[in-house]
A protein has these predicted regions:
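Extended, low-hydrophobicity segments enriched in charged/polar residues
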Residues: 2-258
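Generic alpha-helix signal with a bias toward terminal, lower-confidence helices
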Residues: 226, 273, 313-315
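Functional cores of ribonucleases/endoribonucleases
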Residues: 238-295
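Compact beta-sheet-dominated globular domain cores
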Residues: 279-321
Length: 321
């Protein structure tokens, strides 16, 4: 589905940086939400940026959109990720470092093109990012009722206490995948051996964007200061979700999400022989995270095809020790 605009022939796609909206309901500038994100160590290694794009987005052409996003000069100027040494850099800089062993002359050519004061600020003469690896993230939930069961008597042992359905039930602390698991909520979210809670949420529910946001805030970063109550996690997850996702009511008054969400993990570079592995002939990949394959690594592109806005929310897990 594409947005209902008449300039579908506009090409190529360009991105324009948008300012942050007013604090309310923007979770990433709201004082209360930010204080919790900082407490949970989800701000230091995170970035959020908003852009408007010129060419209509079509769900059947997400490959091109995601690639264009990471290859845009404007995006690379305003949105950075962490490299292998945990330094903030543009995707293009990281790709150029990775490709420096292949063709230094082409790298210099690209650098000259970027330095050209007459060049289009949205485009490059030679694409650096040829492809991006991503997955579509289901996003259909329009209420927080999904988490009501965390307060029910159904799960045993309970997630929250009897008589105080907001207070999390504590347990003997255990280390699982680098996380300190000291309550039944965190055990439910990450312990694969927790048979008591494995059916509390279906795999479909766990795949929903709202559930992923809730899990991210509940697990936090490497220096997370955990909560003893459930409501802060719910409140911040709701605020973040509303900041990234938009819903519209149909003719029957039923709300439906119009935002498409994509989770990116790495980008590929190289045309012809440049940037290809000499053995396999495949394009080389560069991770968007310093330590790949951690569940708290995420780079979500939230696309609103009606407004032609894309918001990127990025976080990289960086161990403290």
């Amino acid at each position: 589905m594409s947005a209902p605009h008449g300039d579908a022939a506009v090409a190529p796609r360009a991105f324009i940086k948008l300012p942050d909206p007013p604090s309310s309901p923007w979770a990433f500038t709201d004082a209360s939400s930010r204080s919790f994100l900082r407490k949970w160590d989800l701000e230091k290694h995170a970035r959020v940026a908003r852009f408007r794009y010129t060419k209509p987005f079509h769900r059947m052409d997400a490959d091109e959109f995601v690639r264009d996003f990471f290859d845009s000069d404007v995006v690379n100027e305003h949105f950075h990720v962490l490299d292998r040494t945990a330094r903030w850099r543009s995707v293009r800089e990281i790709v150029r470092d990775a490709s420096s062993r292949d063709e230094p002359d082409e790298r210099a050519t690209n650098a000259d093109a970027d330095a050209d004061p007459d060049a289009d600020p949205n485009l490059t003469k030679n694409k650096i990012v040829e492809k991006a690896s991503y997955a579509k993230t289901p996003c259909a939930v329009t209420s927080m009722s999904l988490f009501d069961r965390l307060r029910d008597d159904t799960p045993h042992p309970r997630i929250t206490r009897v008589g105080d359905c907001d207070c999390l039930v504590r347990k003997i602390e255990d280390q699982i995948d680098g996380f300190a698991v000291a309550d039944n909520l965190r055990s439910c979210l990450i312990d694969a051996c927790d048979e008591n809670h494995e059916t509390l949420f279906s795999e479909t529910e766990k795949g929903e964007f709202l559930f992923k946001i809730f899990s991210h805030v509940a697990l936090g970063g490497s220096m997370c200061q955990y909560e003893e109550r459930l409501s802060p996690y719910e409140d911040v997850a709701k605020a973040v979700y509303k900041s990234l996702v938009r819903a519209k009511k149909d003719e029957n008054g039923i709300a439906a999400v119009v935002t498409d969400v994509y989770s990116a993990t790495e980008v590929f570079f190289g045309t012809g022989t440049t940037g290809h592995d000499a053995t396999t002939g495949k394009k080389k990949a560069v991770s968007l995270f310093p330590r790949p394959n951690h569940r708290q690594n995420f780079c979500y592109l939230c696309v609103d095809p009606w407004r032609r806005h894309v918001t990127v929310w990025y976080h990289a897990h960086v161990p403290h020790w």
